[in-house]
Amino acid sequence: MRRAVGTVLALGLVMWGSVAPGAPVVNAEPAVVDLGTLPGGSESSTVAINDDGVVVGRAKDAQGLSRPVRWDADHRIAELPLPPQARYATVFGVDASGAAFGNTGGPDGWERAVRWNPDGSTTVLDLPPGHTRTRALAVNDGGTVVGHAYTVGQSQVAVRWDASGAATALPGVEGARWTEAQAIDEGGAVAGISTVEHDLSDDLHYVRWDDGALTDLGTVPGNTHASVQGINGRYVIGTHRPVDRSGYALRWDGSERAEVPGGGTNRLAEVDAEGTAFGMVGGRPARWTAGGEVVVQALPEGYGSGQVLALNAHGATAGVAISAQRQPVRWSASGEVTALPFPSPPSPRSAIFASDVNDRGVVVGEAGGRALLWP
């Protein structure tokens, strides 16, 4: 889920390349809630949380199979039911009403985008005429979903589903055979990728749609992989990878493209309404201002790297600090960093991170195979 952010808030952070002291670390240890697992299951993980505290993610059942799940605001877990044709499903987001969104699949390549409604019922999102499969990738608070659909010949068209589940195909660049919508903002603006020949590096077009109208944001020479991580109003963030597979982070202000300085170890996860992007620059959690300045965020003592993974409407962020072991963290809008506790020491190789933060500052994540919530 992407959230529109109305203001840029000054984070008391370390300037990239400077020796200024970092923001203070919050010493008070916050509470942690273990969200639990399905009956008989042993593992769970979160993906997203809405502002009412509804959480979605996955959990293993008693047979060890991964299932999509939703926790209500009282932290009660429920398995999300599969459509009759489906054999498995994944969930990626939740809207303001508590509806969960994901994808289901079954035999013979059957695959459909799906919404799990707040009342527990399941809605398979519409299939555009002439297409055989669908996949959803992003949703906004209003329940508008974007993704793509496949034809029999395996060409791909970008799709937007409204809150009723009705599908609209979005145009690609001229002659496009593969087009995918990958991000949507709260105003309904959409961004993604469109290409004529999937194996031609110079033909990977970054695109956006406003009220369904296509804008070609151009290509990056030598690009072997293109993706969009977010859109917020006039700003789009994305990634390109050259032959060496390093990752270069990009931002568009309207149609004007800029690249994060510092080489090919950069990733962006979120962008606010003023164009400040958040993610990882040079292995450190950072924000990249609309003016082009990279500002490194403070880390807990003993940690040298990390990444911002989520942003809320008030400028608070969440993510992970990295050393020999990973540590979920939350940054306030003023730049204070808090190391988020977890119930028992997980193995060093287990997944440990904060995956989302809602507009009330509540963070969800995972440590040691357990879904966790930090109020």
Question: Predicted segment positions?
Answer:
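Secretory targeting and sorting signals
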Residues: 1-27
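Residue-level hotspots at or immediately adjacent to binding/recognition sites across diverse folds
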Residues: 4, 22-375
